[in-house]
A protein has these predicted regions:
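Short, glycine-/polar-rich solvent-exposed loops and beta-turns at beta-strand/coil boundaries
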Residues: 16-19, 36-41, 200-202, 238-240, ...
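Outer-membrane beta-barrel transmembrane strand signature
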Residues: 114-175, 184-186, 190, 257-292, ...
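Extracytoplasmic gating/loop element in the C-terminal half of outer-membrane beta-barrel translocons
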Residues: 322-324, 446, 760-871, 876
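Conserved small-residue
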Residues: 61-145, 385, 591, 608-732, ...
């Protein structure tokens, strides 16, 4: 949605000091948000900052908060023997005679790990590692020749994560009036440390705000709002993504300890990493005039200038310590691989508005309000990047303090700009506040579109009927004190269609490279891409919204109810055009060829009652749901990834996930024997899954059996289209449904309590995360504490454990690939972990999002110290989950990211969702 702060569009709400905010209003229907233009296509959030009123006394407010964070959910490893045994089983099934990580063979490692488990209680924390002495004292590692063997069970959670990462915020403001002038000023500071225990990241923010308003005459008011925000981010810029590597191979490798004081690779890289620093400065100045020309006519003008400046600086340091293999410390990253870089991006924006309001009431019955105006916006953007290798000193990572050859230098730059303008008007009419009418219109232009398609007109309107104000409602007013029916229709144009110049074919440059065969010398050659095909007639996406609503106030508005049903249709969506023949040699250009329809509803119920001067209670509840359907798309109806425009098709519910329906595990009874090549012979009546096997994997007892939905006797995905999808079906949807929240709280004799609950009723996710499936990625060979219940079919060893109570099928390494099912390649996963109903992740949840308990001292006590108000409070965020649909999956249900994509198998290997405890105070002098 578009964020508008004091009438000015803002891209990032986090740049605003929360204590400066006076109110927040959300506009969802097109009729009310259309007046804000093309950037309001998905609603508007109106933020009003604090401003003194005429006659206000001067007061000073101070707010302070101190908090500590920890992770809500973290994965863990089982003991090391369990990890090794799982990897050995998986690789043995693949036909591998040996399993190793950098020379450590798991079958040789297993006896040491078993003895370590017998000789130690629990996991090992960070510290000096003990060498092997004998079988009665195996220590933590053993060097056999030049080959290290690591088998200690390190406590990854304790070593790497801080359970009390500190943060604090302070804010002081001065507000009041003097004569015809009102003012509000504030200064804020916020700092936060992340939960990474080793070389943690830090974030700081500084805010300064000045709001001034003065009556120059009795008819002319002028004002200015000046904001400055600095955000300072600093973190270790290590060679590896730490969250990827600490959860990649196992708790035994790579060790999180030291030998002779030397750290191992991952710890060393984190400790010795340079600090990546990002500084974001935002300057914003807004000046406005309001002229009351007559009693009914006002003229308004405002101008805003904003600069966003981003400066980044970092380096790649050399690293010394114990490497993947070897028995002595070494340069893990040598001096010749060091470098430093800097980049800067600067965005400058100005926005101007001029509008006239005319309000007139006739006979206290007919009320008119007419507004007309014009606005414009212009943005310019510049980017610069420079990098030079081989630092003289790690302590001074500056560009001019490097000695690398010039042919290794890198310099890059780019520039961009866009502009928009619009004429707008609004007419409001009501008759005695009962019959309500509003008409809006905008004529918008954007630089993103070619001549002839830059400008478009977007109308909207709404009607309302306050039936509770009618005479016939008098007898019901004590019960239903307020009632209004609403209907609105509106069109909004969306200009956010990708690049600033999507209708212009551009030639991209390729980083210079050595091409000796082309010029006969070992020098770099400049290269250029072929221009992409573009449509020369791109224009606005048109979003049409219908909204029907009912507002009720019950029992003198002690209870209020609001209900809305809406339909939002997006026409002329930017989408891939019709497929081009392969001989063209270019990708399909995007055109205004798509349509999407969304239908949804929202319900809010609020209750508030003041029982006595000392006791007041309240409760609020809201819930909403929506579903989007693709109604037009140029596609051959190929099914695939749920949120990929490349696979969208007419009739698709946006976010749908395709997959197999899981039947059960195969048992020996499903087969009659084996073929000469080792593949199983399916028993009569059992659908054959041979066609979806890949690599050396062969379905057998203990593996997943899919349902034969089309009755063909063969499990497949057909042609991967809507008309022929074999045994595939829609198994879920990755978009949230039934999002809800409720507040419960009250006040009693100075105490205040507020509990905020928030949740999602239904949401599915298919992922190839290693935290979901054991031995998912062949490069990892990892198994986690939530994955130790799996089938085993090793009759040659006398071990057969196949049970529907086991969480997972027989193990096999490397299941992250695309597989051999047409229609599922875009989603990924194969073997036992093709997309399917059994392992679809349930992301529904109900969370106590926040609980706050406060106490305000009696005024009789505080006024003696010239304090108007003094409040202390304690608060907890993300305290616990009352419902977690994903069960023992060690990932927070609000987690959406990972190192890499969901399909890469690393979902969850990122900064975790956190819970926090805090206390604070609020003082007004």
């Amino acid at each position: 949605p578009l964020i508008v702060v004091d009438g000015v569009p803002t891209d990032n709400l986090s740049m605003i000091n929360g204590n400066d905010i006076a109110s927040i209003t959300v506009l969802k229907d097109a009729a009310s948000s259309s007046i804000y233009g093309s950037r309001a296509a998905f609603g508007v959030i109106l933020v009003t900052t604090k401003q003194a009123k005429k006659g206000d006394r001067i007061s000073v407010n101070y707010n302070a908060n101190f908090a500590w964070d920890k992770s809500t959910y973290l994965p863990d490893y089982p003991d090391v023997p369990t990890q090794l045994e799982a990897a050995l089983r998986a690789k043995a099934r693949q036909g591998s005679g040996s399993v190793e990580l950098f020379g450590m063979y798991f079958d040789q490692l297993l006896p040491y790990a078993q003895k370590w488990k017998e000789q130690n209680s629990g996991k090992k924390g960070y510290g000096e590692m003990r060498p092997y002495v004998d079988d009665n004292n195996v220590g933590d590692y053993r060097f056999i020749g030049n080959q290290p063997m690591y088998y200690a069970d390190f406590d990854i959670q304790d070593i790497w994560y801080n359970n009390a990462a500190p943060s604090q915020s302070h804010d002081v403001s001065l507000t009041g009036s003097s004569g015809n002038t009102r003012f509000f000023t504030s200064f804020g500071y916020n700092s936060k440390e992340d939960v990474m225990k080793i070389n943690p990241g830090q974030r700081k923010r500084y805010n300064a705000t000045v709001n001034l308003q003065t009556d120059i005459t009795d008819w002319l008011t002028a004002g200015a709002r000046i904001n400055y925000t600095r955000r300072h981010f600093s973190r270790a810029d290590s060679w590896n993504n730490m969250y990827q590597y600490i959860w990649r191979w196992g708790s035994f490798f790579i060790p999180s300890g030291t030998i002779d004081g030397q750290d191992f690779r991952v710890v060393a890289m984190q400790k010795q990493a340079a600090r990546k620093v990002l500084v974001n400065d935002q300057y914003k100045v807004n000046a406005f005039l309001k002229a009351n020309v007559t009693k009914d006519l006002t003229v308004n003008a405002d101008f805003t200038w904003q600069v966003d400046d981003f400066n980044s600086k970092s380096a790649d340091n050399s690293v010394y310590g114990m490497n993947w293999s070897g028995t002595s410390p070494q340069w893990i990253v040598g001096q010749s691989n060091t470098d430093t870089w800097r980049d800067n991006s600067k965005m400058e924006t100005w926005t101007a508005n001029f509008y006239v309001n005319y309000a007139k009431s006739i006979n206290d019955a007919h009320n008119f309000n007419v507004m007309a105006g014009v606005n414009g916006e212009n943005m310019t953007y510049d980017y610069f990047y420079a990098q030079r290798p081989e630092l003289y000193s790690l302590d001074q990572p500056e560009l001019n303090l490097t000695y690398g050859a010039k042919n290794k230098w890198e310099i890059n730059a780019s520039t961009n700009d866009r502009a928009s303008a619009g004429y707008f008007g609004r007419i409001n009419y009501d008759y005695k506040g009962i019959y309500l009418l509003e008409l809006n219109g905008r004529y918008d232009g954007s630089s993103r579109f070619p001549a002839g398609d830059k400008w478009a007109f977007f109308p909207s309107g709404s009607i309302g009927y306050r039936f509770s104000q009618e005479a016939y409602w008098d007898k019901l007013r004590e019960t239903v004190s307020n009632g209004k029916l609403r209907f609105s229709y509106g069109e909004i144009g969306n200009e956010n269609v990708g690049s600033s110049w999507p209708y212009i074919a551009t030639i991209g440059t390729i980083s210079a490279s050595y091409v000796g065969w082309l010029n006969g010398s070992n020098t770099k050659v400049n290269e250029f891409d072929l221009p992409e095909w573009v449509s020369s007639s791109l224009t606005w996406e048109r979003i049409k919204t219908i909204d029907i609503g009912l507002d009720l106030g019950l029992l003198n508005d002690m209870v209020t109810v609001g209900f809305d049903w809406y339909q939002r249709t997006t026409n002329d969506m930017i989408a891939p055009g019709k497929a081009l023949p392969p001989s063209v040699g270019a990708s399909t250009p995007t055109t205004n060829s798509g349509s999407l329809r969304t239908r949804g509803w929202e319900l809010t119920i609020n209750w508030r009652k003041q029982f006595t001067n000392d006791l007041g209670l309240y409760a609020n509840f809201s819930i909403g749901d929506s579903k989007s359907v693709v109604t037009k798309w140029d596609n051959d109806q190929n099914i695939g990834h749920p949120l990929s425009t490349a696979y969208a098709y007419a009739g698709q519910v946006w976010g749908d996930i395709w997959g197999f329906e899981t039947d059960r595990y195969f048992t020996e009874a499903d087969f009659t024997g084996k073929n000469a090549d080792g593949s199983w012979i399916y028993a009569p009546g059992v659908a054959d899954q041979t066609g979806i096997q890949t690599q050396t994997f062969v379905y057998g007892p203990g593996d997943i059996k899919f349902k034969d939905l089309d009755g063909s006797g063969v499990i497949d995905g057909g042609k991967g289209t809507v008309d022929d999808h074999g045994d595939l079906k829609v198994i879920g949807n990755c978009l949230p449904r039934y999002e809800y929240s409720f507040h419960i709280g009250g006040t009693y004799k100075g105490f205040d309590l507020d509990l905020f609950f928030q949740g999602v009723g239904k949401r599915d996710m298919w992922t190839q995360s290693s935290f979901v499936f054991p031995e998912m990625r062949e490069a990892d060979l990892a198994i986690y504490a939530n994955q130790t219940s799996y089938n085993i079919y090793e009759p040659e060893k006398g071990i057969v454990n196949i049970s529907e109570s086991n969480a997972f099928p027989c193990l096999y390494p490397g299941n992250e690939y695309a597989g051999n099912v047409t229609g599922l390649a875009g989603e990924g996963g194969c073997h036992n972990y093709y997309p399917q109903t059994k392992y679809l992740v349930d992301m529904s949840y109900l969370r106590l999002k926040n609980v706050t308990l406060g106490y305000t001292l009696p005024v009789e006590l505080t006024k003696k110290a010239f304090v108007q108000k003094l409040r202390f409070y304690v608060s907890c965020n993300n305290l616990f989950l009352l419902h977690k649909g994903s069960g023992d999956l060690p990932i927070d249900p609000e987690m959406n990211a990972g190192q890499g994509a969901l399909g890469y198998g690393t979902w969850g290997r990122t900064y975790p969702t956190t819970k926090s405890w805090s206390f604070g105070l609020q003082v007004t002098f």
